[in-house]
Amino acid sequence: MATKKTSQAGKPAVIGRLMPAMRRSSAAGVLHGQAIARKVGVNSSDLECLDLILLNGPSTAGEIARRTGLTSGAVTGLIDRLERLGLVERTADANDRRKVLVRVREDKIGPIGALFSPLEKSIGAILAGYSREELRTLLDFFERSGEVLLARVAELNDGK
């Protein structure tokens, strides 16, 4: 059985390989998103914002601006474009009628989801090869690194 000392010996080398692997994966994800956006007929930023709304649920324009760092005018243009395509709708907030929420029209995004389906199947096949504990480790890593990324985005948007 490996001791903690011997199991840690190669850790810097693995981390050294992980960092560029993460960058390559991130770049590949961006390129995949751009290819999907071209197929759908939207720009890649609009597609990413659509996904953020889908992930976060109905959102106000202000919430979208805070999450993305876009100006209020840019967010209005984004919502207008997505609404023209029938992908989102503006609705009054049931709890505060003064608020307008942007909701993804899930009945209209099926064709976009279908474009992501082959990737989801391929990634699912890779994930199936990991143990439950390894999957928990991956989940922990992605949740924590996602938080770090969003914090850095907020810092950059605040001029830091």
Placement of each model-derived feature along the sequence:
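C-terminal regulatory/oligomerization modules of transcriptional regulators
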Residues: 1-9, 132-160
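N-terminal leader segment of winged-helix/HTH proteins
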Residues: 1-40
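A structural signal for well-ordered alpha-helices, especially hydrophobic packing surfaces
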Residues: 26-29, 127, 146-150
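N-terminal helix-turn-helix DNA-binding core of bacterial DNA-binding proteins
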Residues: 32-71
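Canonical helix-turn-helix DNA-binding module
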Residues: 58-100
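Charged, amphipathic alpha-helical coiled-coil/dimerization segments
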Residues: 83-136
